[in-house]
Regions:
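Extreme N-terminal basic, low-complexity initiation segments
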Residues: 3-7
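Short, Lys/Arg-enriched N-terminal segments with co-localized hydrophobic residues
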Residues: 8-33
């Protein structure tokens, strides 16, 4: 079984210098992946360590993930957990996909980080693969989804300044959208009354929010200062709401008529998730700029912002940059991830298994709506039990997320099968029954 090394500094290759001054590789001792038993800690002691030293912004699942493979995570006791959250849409080619792991480890042996002064092979090969696959001209590498969106916002604003003047910076985004947690992407997120924006002082100005899937509302927000419209093809954090065909086509037409840029945030939907390599390809609508991350790296941190030549040329030396962006190991892993998704037609699998998943979810008790595209699916209940359903499923070693009180979201690796769905549905039925009984008991008691 393939195993990752615990940390980048613990490589399986040692180096020595020969008489000619060159560096020759010699085999080193393999280091095991870190296991709980190797630390001398108990499970509870490790959890206490996390709680003591780490900032608490995440609701933890109550188990230690020691390793992962395919559709499963394994805890410190070797017990399997069926993965229907995929690291939040990251592990699309499967947890610890062998090709992605091999590409990263092989690249570590050659070169890891250089900054962006010299040319590197992984950067070049990945850039060509991405641009030719999705029909865009240029790529700017980043390290995460929020950085990719920051890049997209900056590029749009720079385009507005260069072509129309410094007042052309206004961007319209969607209510209940989500674009990230750094200041530009946070301001673009149409959730002003939630913890995402509350308590952080004034938001970056220049954003207005319109109702998702309401073309007239978006059109009404356009002013003389507007330069772009920015949306997600499927609102993930907003409850899993896909854009309608009419809405997407209408936004493209509106942008063309008003001289605006269309920005698509495909951090979650990109690379096969919705049934096509990029979600916009399924709509037949091309953006001026698109962001991506998550599945792109197949488990390694990487993001990117892709644009047309006309828009991309506003970025010149000094206008944007990043120390780690385009990291050789991340690019090598991303090339393997994208290749796996394309060569194995995981987009097609997402369409087929996604249809089956929605069909089976709709048969469950208390389900009033099932929506989504491909393997990005939301299941909404007629009572507020989503969080408790998630907890009950965790007890049965099946993982998925909750959005608010009433929606569970399924975003598994794109290698999921109908058999995996059947296992999920069995557990969800039991979990819904338990959660609903608790809710009704509590309601009667209250």
């Amino acid at each position: 079984m393939r195993r990752l090394f615990f940390f980048l500094s613990h490589l399986s290759v040692l180096y020595r210098e020969d008489s000619s001054g060159t560096m020759n590789r010699t085999p080193g001792r393999r280091r095991r992946t870190m296991r709980l038993r190797d630390t001398g800690l108990t499970a509870e002691e490790l959890k206490e360590m996390v709680n003591k030293y780490m900032v608490e912004t995440y609701e933890r699942y109550d188990f230690i993930a020691e390793r992962a493979e395919g559709m499963y995570l394994y805890d410190e006791k070797g017990m399997p957990y069926l993965d229907f959250y995929g690291g939040v849409a990251v592990n699309s080619p499967g947890n610890c996909n062998p090709e992605v792991v091999k590409a990263a480890k092989d690249q570590m042996d050659d070169i890891m980080h250089t900054f962006n002064y010299p040319y590197t092979i992984p950067q070049a090969l990945l850039a060509k693969k991405v641009c030719e696959t999705i029909g865009m001209d240029k790529i700017f590498y980043q390290n995460s989804g929020t950085e990719a969106n920051e890049c997209m916002i900056k590029m749009a604003r720079k385009y507005g300044t260069d072509h129309y003047g410094p007042e052309k910076y206004h961007i319209i985004t969607a209510k209940k959208g989500f674009h990230g947690r750094t200041f530009g992407s946070m301001a673009a997120t149409g959730q002003p009354d939630t913890a995402i924006q509350q308590g952080f002082g004034p938001m970056l100005e220049g954003f207005s929010y319109a109702r998702y899937n309401d073309l007239n509302d978006f059109a009404s927000k356009v002013t003389e200062n507007t330069i772009a419209i920015m949306i997600e093809p499927v609102q993930g954090e907003g409850g899993v709401y896909p854009a309608t065909q009419e809405f997407m086509e209408g936004l493209r037409k509106l942008c063309d008529e008003k001289g605006l840029l269309l920005l698509l945030d495909e951090v979650q939907t990109g690379w096969g998730r919705t049934g096509t390599p990029m979600a916009y390809m399924g709509y037949g609508v091309k953006p001026d700029i698109v962001s991506m991350a998550k599945a792109m790296g197949g488990g390694m941190p990487i993001g990117a912002c892709c644009a047309t030549d006309e828009v991309a040329r506003v970025f010149t030396a000094g206008t944007h940059g990043s120390t780690y962006a385009g990291h050789a190991v991340a690019c090598a892993a991303a090339l393997a991830s994208v290749t796996e998704i394309l060569d194995k037609d995981l987009s097609g699998n997402a369409r087929r298994v996604g249809r089956y998943l929605k069909q089976e979810l709709s048969k469950l008790p208390h389900v009033k709506d099932v929506r989504g595209k491909g393997l990005l699916v939301g299941c909404e209940y007629d009572i507020p039990i989503a969080v408790e359903v998630k907890h009950e499923a965790l007890e049965r070693r099946v993982l998925f997320t909750a959005i608010g009180d009433s929606v569970n979201r399924m975003i598994p690796p794109l290698i999921a099968t109908k058999k995996d769905v059947d296992q999920l549905i069995r557990v969800m039925r039991e979990s819904i029954d338990e959660a609903a009984a608790k809710y009704l008991d509590m309601k009667m008691a209250g």
